[in-house]
Structures are given as structure tokens and as C-alpha cells.
Amino acid sequence: MFRAKERASAMNIIVYAIPFFVLAIVLELFYGWIKQRNTYRLNDSISSLSLGVLSQGRRFVTLGIGAYVYHLITVYFSLPLMDASQWYTWVLAMVIYDFFYYWLHRMGHERTILWAAHVAHHQSEDYNLTTALRQTSTGFLLGWVFFIPMYLLGIPAEVVVTVGAINLVYQFWVHTEHVPKLGWYEWIFVTPSNHRVHHAQNDCYMDRNYGGLFILWDRLFGTFQEELEKEPAVFGIRGALKSWNPVKALTHVYVEMFQDSWHTAHWRDKIKVWFSRTGWRPADVAMRFPREKTDLSQFERYDPKVPPLVAIYGFFQLVFVALLLNLMQTNELAYWHGFAGWGVLLTTAVTTAFWLEGRPAEKNVNWEFLRLAAVLSILVVAGPSGDDVGNLLFATSYGAVNLSFLWFLSRKKHATGSVPAV
């Protein structure tokens, strides 16, 4: 099937890259400690990586229209297919893909409905390699439209998705504060320096540097901004999220659009809200429900303090969802099994966020027992392992460790103190 082949090509590259991602994160963390310039906080990193896990797991619960449209175009409307065995097909596809990625990325900042899908990637107020893995779960809704021309041009599907995966993997390493400007390389390619600009909320850096592989598009279309020594980047978004909850991270702009559309008295504005330039609001709604203006001179990162054991528990749950996702990806699952597995990923990420936000332990423990009972039932009945015994062992091991944590967390003496940045 067209869609199965398309998925497998991209997924394999990303899955193979994961061990290198983990190693690079460890090395960056170690380097920051040595240089006494740590750029990691455990709570922010758990939040970013949890969103990355949900993004990768999203394919188990969605049926994207994009692949079907691509198939129709390839069969009925495209130019003759290019030869995927020729090197120039791949080079051409790489350049063309990045060109359309530039416009997707740019519109993802300039149009509210596309910003709603992209905003999760920018919410981190740290800038490190885990930020690169902080991905949306809703980009599939409209992002595919921008790459239709590649299929019309006759570029084979396996080439498109492969160069897309390579483009995505390339972007991983540019999410770091530790790499300085790179001379001539800055003129052609996306680098850590010019991508730091992209993630900053400073006035002079806003809405700049959209390229994925090549920075040439930004220079050509007037959206390039060099990183300035006199203007240190302040990372994050205007109107900070102030939450580790992945559901809020993925939906808050959609919710804001819906609220503005609902409250405005003008029918034209009810539609315009969704497709307007980012930041625009109906005048009557902006007057009735004003939003707080961002003052970067008073900026403080969202960083609720929690007991050390809570932080360790959060890391344990991150390891669990990452392991579960890996098992889901390496085994053929029935659709409802995949759907149930993604539900486990989501509920675990949400309850972990409750802990990391510093909510009272007694309330969290009650929610955790409910979640754990549901999770263990799903793991036994519809687990990701290839056999029932494997599912039972996986569920038993996870349940035993989880219950041990909850026993300690329910004791008041372990619910005090706080943990600093990693």
C-alpha cells in the first residue's frame, strides 16, 4: 500500500536516529555541567520529551487524509515519476522539500490555525536538544497541503517522505546553546545560532529564520535575522503556557480561537479568527476579554519546585512511556490496541504533569491509583508485546515499581523539599 510504504520509510530513519538523539542529549547535559552552563531543567525536559512521545504515537490513532490525497495525485495528476535510483532526484527533492517546508513553517507562525499546530514546539523556555523533540500531535491536519506540489512534479512518494525525515533529523542538532556561529556555514544552512533566533521571543527576533535545512530561503524572502551579541535570546512564547500539561500544550491556541469565534458578535469575524494573522483578535472580543501583555524585562521561566522524589517519579514515567512507544512501534498492533496504547501514553503524561506542577500529593495519589488500574488492565488485555505472557510481565513489572513510588509519595515526609534544575 502507498500509505504503508510511505510511513515505513520515514519511521525507520527516525527510529534508527533515536539512540543517537539520546546519546547527544546526555553529552550536551554532561558538557553543560563541565562548563558550568547547564541548559537543562528536568521538568521542562520531561515535558518536551513527553510531547515528542505523543507526537510519534499519534499515528496509532489518526487516519490522515494527506496520504490518500497524495495517492490520488500520484495516480491521476502527477507528471511522470522521476527515477528514484538517480542521485539527482534525491538532491532535487531535498532542495524542493526544504523550500515548501520554509513556507509551511512560515505560515505556521503567521496564520493562527497553523500556529495552533506548531506552538507546542516553541513553548519550552529552555533551548536544548530535548526542545528539538518537543513536537506537535496536530500538524497532520493541514501540514500535508504544502507538499502537494512535490507529488504533482512526479517526485516518488518514498523519496518525499525520506528526504522529509532527513530534514527533520537534521534539525535536531541546531537546538543547542553551546555551539557558536559557524562562519561561512551560517550563510547557507540552518545552524544553532540562526535557529536560536527563531525560538526567541525578543521583538527583533520574532518570526524570523524559518528554514529547515537551508537558511537561503530566509535571506531570499526577507525573513533572515542574525543572532546579536547585544540581544541575548529569551526563549518561549508570548503569553507563556505556565503548565506541563500536554493536553493544554497541544490545544490551548485552538481553545482560544474557539472562544474568540464564539464570543464575537460579527459573523465575518467568527470565520476570520481561524485564518487571520497570528495575534489578531476581533475588536469586540479583545475589549471584553483582554489578554495580558508580555513584558520581557519581567520575564521569569515557569519552574514550580517539587520534592526530589516527585522529580524522580516523573523521570520514571518518562522512561515508561518511551519504552511503551518503542514496543508499540516494533510490534504489529490491531487498531484498537494502538488506540488503547496511545491512551496510556496520554494519561500517563498528563498525570505526570500534575505531579511536576506541584499539585498536592494526596490529590495526585488518588488520580494515580485510578490511572494505574486502567493502565495495567490495558497492558494485560491489549499490551504492546507480541504475546500474552510478555504483556503480563510488562504490566506486573511496571505496576510493582509504580506502587512502590506511590507508597513513598503518599508519606508526608517525602512530599517536602524541592529539586533544582538538572
Language model segments and positions:
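Substrate-recognition/cap regions that form aromatic- and gly/pro-loop-enriched pockets
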Residues: R301-G417
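Membrane-embedded catalytic scaffold of the fatty acid hydroxylase/desaturase
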Residues: V53-T62, A84-P246
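Hydrophobic transmembrane alpha-helical segments in integral membrane proteins
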Residues: S9-V22
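Juxtamembrane "helix exit" motif at the C-terminal ends of alpha-helical transmembrane segments
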Residues: M11-N12, T62-L81, W144-V160, G164, ...
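Select subsegments of transmembrane alpha-helices in polytopic membrane proteins
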Residues: L51-G64, A132-G139, K305-F316, V365-E368
